[in-house]
Regions:
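C-terminal motif of bacterial Sec signal peptides marking the signal peptidase cleavage site
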Residues: 16-20
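Bacterial signal peptide processing site
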Residues: 22-25
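Acidic/histidine-rich, surface-exposed loop or edge segments in extracytoplasmic proteins
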Residues: 33-43, 128-131
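Post-signal-peptide N-terminal segment of Sec-exported extracytoplasmic proteins
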Residues: 42-74
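Surface-exposed short loop/turn segments
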Residues: 63-70, 74-116, 121-138, 142
Length: 165
């Protein structure tokens, strides 16, 4: 059997098997995409708050108009030295970003979903001050993007459950 035919057959079988077991993509659920687009993000002040807020605005594809939901965020950052040299100077740091969020109905201000995501990553600290600051800012950007991605997935799963029979 030619390899292309075998690959096509395998793909067709996989599609049938996934369809038979009730698999459906998360965003195929009615109301998930529109629910996510109806969220206004209320990010805290500061660099990381701005980064998380912008990443969530991009991920949720917020549309103009009066939102049905408001997402309140509370962020906390921690930085731990790891990998110490002989002279007791850290060469690596662990950066931890914790994002607690509350999804509120804008009509009643009642909390609908409460959650927390935690992102941990490490970065190198160079001897040059500018390189060290750039590495820390890069870690903040990566952590903010990952926190926004996780919040988006949790909210999408919640919206999918709300519309499920």
């Amino acid at each position: 059997m030619p390899p292309r035919l075998a690959a096509a057959l395998a793909l067709a079988c996989a599609t049938l098997i996934l369809g038979a077991c009730g698999f459906s993509p998360l965003y195929a659920q009615p109301g998930v995409t529109s629910g996510l687009a109806d969220i206004q993000v209320a990010a805290p002040r500061g660099r990381v708050g701005y980064l998380v807020g912008e990443a969530l605005d991009d991920a949720l594809a917020t549309r103009p108009g009066a939102p049905a939901w408001r997402l309140d965020l509370d962020l906390s950052e921690q930085r731990f030295p790891r990998g110490l040299r002989v002279d007791n100077v850290a060469t690596r740091y662990e950066y931890v970003l914790t994002a607690a969020y509350t999804l509120r109905d804008t009509a009643t201000d009642a909390p609908a979903k409460v959650g927390r995501v935690r992102v941990e990553l490490t970065y190198d600290s160079a001897d040059q001050p500018y390189a060290s600051v750039a590495a820390q800012q890069d870690a903040q950007e990566r952590a903010a993007a990952e926190a926004a991605r996780r919040i988006q997935l949790e909210l999408a799963a919640w919206f999918a459950q709300q519309d499920a029979p």
